[in-house]
């Protein structure tokens, strides 16, 4: 106070004011401080001081030709005096106003294209809806979030190459544009930015915003997709939140969401196949999301979700070192443990073999709706501090932590037998057995856990076995906190291995992920997911299996046809026919298959009975292991639309309808494709398939000796003729082609010639 009084007294004397405002600053230290280096030391002051001058701006000399000396009001726009130390002109701020009003205009066509991300943001905000503001405690946890809506997912290096190619195409330096997305973007941007006058550096900067994902580690309480993060400052404070619905979606959020759905579907489907890992890879490689190959997205997209990480591990990509249990991501923050097998008895006296972690460890647990800090020793929970959105979410976290602790009182709380199985009907491992058991009903677990009196700690509160809050007592070692636990911030990725049952381990052999951890939540994808793999046909139900099977046959008819006549067994074993079997009534599968195979054999033997449409129609039925029976069928049943529907062996039905006029096939009313050849021609009769590489010349000609069997033909030299016995004892004259013919000789010609030769 004394000092302030003294200063007040000084300031009241006019001499003090004069000294402070008028005298020059000539203290060397001060002059040095403000003049050394190029960096402005006090930009705000400098700006104020400059703008107080008449001509604070310098410009190139050319400005004198482009701007008049005075404006309409007669104010001077530039001074004839040169800027000290350069040959530039001193200009007034009024010149900027004049230029903005009267200066040359330029085409604005490129602005929305270059500043695309900004224009789109404005649109999203314009159409967004802001709801009421609520005042309440915000449990924010730091998560790694995407702060840049509307971007592609190129790596920094890939983006750099694209930007160089688009903005500085003539610069020297090797640029490798390999990925599909790189090439597409480059082509698109070059077209968009032809004759663009915007400064190349600005264009490059804006392109980077469009191409690369930028993430930050931010405290978030609500939605984490990028369209919510861009308005984070408007939607959540320390003690308030504002409801907000984005006015539009962006491709990157849609990709993340659709990728998770595709990965979950694929992992679930792979789990039940004979070789889960091989199936998973086959599906990842043949799936497209929004028209982009899933494997390309997996390589670029940093989304961390259990199913996505399993797919990445299968592809040999690095993933986060944290592990997953009960839908929570665990990250060990201190301590260490060794694993040891131990046998324990449940409350039902069932023996479980569990792998016990021996040693003191601390973990952070992060889930979608709850987070926690867990401290544990060997088979003992020391402390659990939980925070969550609601009672239910907190309970979920507590159950997972209790099971993870492997405490004896938890194992003794099991009532009844543990026999949970996964989708492939295999027993779950003991830890997941326990988890499933208590997720179904945790009453006994909470009752048996024990309670303790608690101290009054700021921001902490107790929780009772019935999940109600309390300030006096709490479940032993467990407290509920107002503060969330931050997600693990590191983006470090580690090398992992995956076994054929899709269990992912780090290099020490710890299991990080397994299919049991993949969420069963079903969602609707934002982008179209195209599963080309036949394993995924059943995802959309029986109708989809039916349509897809027939579409596949038609698409591959050329090769199917040859296999049908030469190597049917191999054809019947194709995996594309597997899903179809689930539509055929179990009891009838073998009989149908035997019947169809016999029918096909007759077609191969009897000339002219070959019928493309019928082969296509009946082929999927032949894939089941056949039963030898004399049974004949006029229709075959498939289970779709909740009941049995009939496919007629001869003729059309609502299930399978071939239109001769349009040559198109409809299956259950859906178009399944067109047959490119004329089915009436007995298409490529078997004969021409068998006689590949031979030209049919006409009827038998005795001069060329006795009729050979089809097998003996292989001995003919090129250009040599011979009689050959085909079908039901008909003999025709053939010549071995002089050049090797394509896989399918013009089949219709061949069939016609056989007919002519015989008739």
Curated annotation (Swiss-Prot):
Residues carrying the site annotation Avian adaptation: 627
Subcellular localization(s) per the UniProt record: Virion; Host nucleus
The keyword Transcription is assigned to this record: no
Keywords on record: Cap snatching, Eukaryotic host gene expression shutoff by virus, Eukaryotic host transcription shutoff by virus, Host gene expression shutoff by virus, Host nucleus, Host-virus interaction, Inhibition of host RNA polymerase II by virus, mRNA capping, mRNA processing, Viral transcription, Virion
GO cellular component: host cell nucleus; virion component
GO biological process: 7-methylguanosine mRNA capping; cap snatching; DNA-templated transcription; symbiont-mediated suppression of host gene expression; symbiont-mediated suppression of host mRNA transcription via inhibition of RNA polymerase II activity; viral RNA genome replication
Pfam families listed in its UniProt record: Flu_PB2_1st, Flu_PB2_2nd, Flu_PB2_3rd, Flu_PB2_4th, Flu_PB2_5th, Flu_PB2_6th, Flu_PB2_7th
Motif (Nuclear localization signal): 736-739
UniProt-listed InterPro entries: Flu_PB2_2nd (IPR049110), Flu_PB2_6th (IPR049114), Flu_PB2_C (IPR049115), Flu_PB2_CAP-bd (IPR048298), Flu_PB2_middle (IPR049111), Flu_PB2_N (IPR049106), INV_PB2 (IPR001591), PB2_helical (IPR049113)
Cell inner membrane among keywords: no
Similarity remark: Belongs to the influenza viruses PB2 family.
Protein name (database record): Polymerase basic protein 2
Organism: Influenza A virus (strain A/Turkey/Minnesota/833/1980 H4N2)
């Amino acid at each position: 106070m004394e000092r302030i009084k003294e200063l007040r007294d000084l300031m009241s004397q006019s001499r003090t004011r004069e000294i402070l405002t008028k005298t020059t600053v000539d203290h060397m230290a001060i002059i040095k401080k403000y003049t050394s280096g190029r960096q402005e030391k006090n930009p705000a002051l400098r700006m104020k001081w400059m703008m107080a001058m008449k001509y604070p701006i310098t410009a190139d000399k050319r400005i004198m030709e482009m701007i008049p000396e005075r404006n309409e009001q007669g104010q001077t726009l530039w001074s004839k005096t040169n800027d000290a130390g350069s040959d530039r002109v001193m200009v007034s701020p009024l010149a900027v106003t004049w230029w903005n009003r009267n200066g040359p205009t330029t085409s604005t066509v490129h602005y929305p294209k270059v500043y695309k991300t900004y224009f789109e943001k404005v649109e999203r905000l314009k159409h967004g809806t802001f709801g009421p503001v609520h005042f309440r405690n915000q449990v924010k946890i730091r998560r790694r979030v995407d702060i840049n809506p509307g971007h592609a997912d190129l790596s920094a290096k890939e983006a750099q190459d694209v930007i160089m190619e688009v903005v500085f195409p003539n610069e020297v330096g090797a640029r490798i544009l390999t990925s599909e997305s790189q090439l597409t973007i480059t082509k698109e941007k070059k077209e968009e930015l032809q004759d663009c006058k915007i400064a190349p550096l600005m264009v490059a900067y804006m392109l980077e915003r469009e191409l690369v994902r930028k993430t930050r580690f931010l405290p978030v309480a609500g939605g984490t997709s990028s369209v919510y993060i861009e308005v984070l400052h408007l939607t959540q404070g320390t003690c308030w939140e504002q409801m907000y619905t984005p006015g539009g979606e962006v491709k990157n959020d849609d990709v993340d969401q659709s990728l998770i759905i595709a990965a979950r579907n694929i992992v679930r489907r792979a789990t039940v196949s004979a070789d889960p890992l091989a199936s998973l890879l086959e599906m990842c490689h043949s799936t497209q999301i929004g028209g982009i190959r899933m494997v390309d997205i997996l390589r670029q997209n940093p989304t961390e979700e259990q199913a996505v990480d399993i797919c990445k591990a299968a592809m040999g990509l690095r993933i986060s070192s944290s592990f997953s249990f009960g839908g929570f991501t665990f990250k060990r923050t201190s301590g260490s443990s060794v694993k040891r097998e131990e046998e324990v008895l449940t409350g039902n006296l069932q023996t479980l073999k569990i792998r016990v972690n021996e040693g003191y460890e601390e973990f952070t647990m992060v889930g979608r709706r709850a987070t926690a800090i867990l401290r544990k020793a060997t088979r003992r929970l020391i402390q659990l501090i939980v925070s969550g959105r609601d009672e239910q979410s907190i309970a979920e976290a507590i159950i997972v932590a209790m099971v993870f602790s492997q405490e004896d009182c938890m194992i003794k709380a099991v009532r009844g037998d543990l026999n949970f199985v996964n989708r492939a009907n295999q027993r779950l491992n003991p830890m997941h057995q326990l988890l499933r058991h208590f997720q179904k009903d945790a009453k006994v677990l909470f009752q048996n856990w024990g309670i303790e009196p608690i101290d009054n700690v700021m921001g902490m509160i107790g929780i009772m076995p019935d999940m109600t809050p309390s300030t006096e007592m709490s479940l032993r070692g467990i407290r509920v906190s107002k503060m969330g636990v931050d997600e693990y911030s590191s983006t470090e990725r580690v090398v992992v291995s995956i076994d054929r049952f899709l269990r992912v381990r780090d290099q020490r052999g710890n299991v990080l992920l397994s299919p049991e951890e993949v969420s069963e939540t079903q969602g609707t994808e934002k982008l179209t997911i195209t599963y080309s793999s036949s394993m995924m046909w059943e995802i959309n139900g029986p109708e989809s299996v039916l349509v897809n099977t027939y579409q596949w046959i038609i698409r591959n008819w050329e090769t199917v046809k040859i296999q049908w006549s030469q190597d049917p067994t191999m054809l019947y074993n194709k995996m594309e026919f597997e899903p179809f079997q689930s539509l055929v009534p179990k009891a009838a599968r073998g009989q149908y298959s035997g019947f169809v195979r016999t029918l096909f054999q007759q077609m191969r033997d009897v000339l002219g009975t070959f019928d493309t449409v019928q082969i296509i129609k009946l082929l999927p039925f032949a894939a089941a292991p056949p039963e030898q029976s004399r049974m004949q069928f006029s229709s075959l049943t498939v289970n779709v639309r909740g009941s049995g529907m009939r496919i007629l062996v001869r003729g059309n039905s609502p299930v399978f309808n071939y239109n001769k006029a349009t040559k198109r096939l409809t299956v259950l009313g859906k178009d399944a494709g067109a047959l490119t050849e004329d089915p009436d021609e007995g298409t490529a009769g078997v004969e021409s398939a068998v006689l590949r590489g031979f030209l049919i010349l006409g009827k038998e000609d005795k001069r060329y000796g006795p009729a050979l069997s089809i097998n003996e033909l292989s001995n003919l030299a090129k250009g040599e003729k011979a009689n050959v016995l085909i079908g039901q004892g008909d003999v025709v004259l053939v010549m071995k082609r002089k050049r090797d013919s394509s896989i399918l000789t013009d089949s219709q010609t061949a069939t016609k010639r056989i007919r002519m030769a015989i008739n």
